[in-house]
Amino acid sequence: MCPLSQIWRPICPILGNVTRSLSLPLHSALELLGGLALLAGPFLLGAGPAGLVAAISLGALLIGMALAGPDALPITAHQSFDLMLVAVLAGAGLGLALSGDLAGGVVLAVVGALELTLVSLTRWVRA
């Protein structure tokens, strides 16, 4: 649905094509893959100690959210946690990259971008 504001009208055809087509079970499965990527990625790319600690900690959180049952949290809480995790992944990725741990920063930033895409494409309704 396109907003009625005159400012948004030029991009309405672009925004109108985005659909929220991922179900919550598929969201959880893809979130699990993202968490596993956070656990394995820094080791494969040779990240430093700070990158390893950050990625393993955030990967464990992401896997925990993916494996939580469908009634473990309200949907809005899960969505809010996912958005908060995106912000933390982006901030930690930027911090690691600026401190010299480029491999760790790239892993966190890529998983953060993928998580943001996942959140934006998910239908936030119980099946």
Language model features with spans:
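Extracellular/lumenal glycan-associated surfaces
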Residues: 27-47, 61-66, 84-100, 112-122
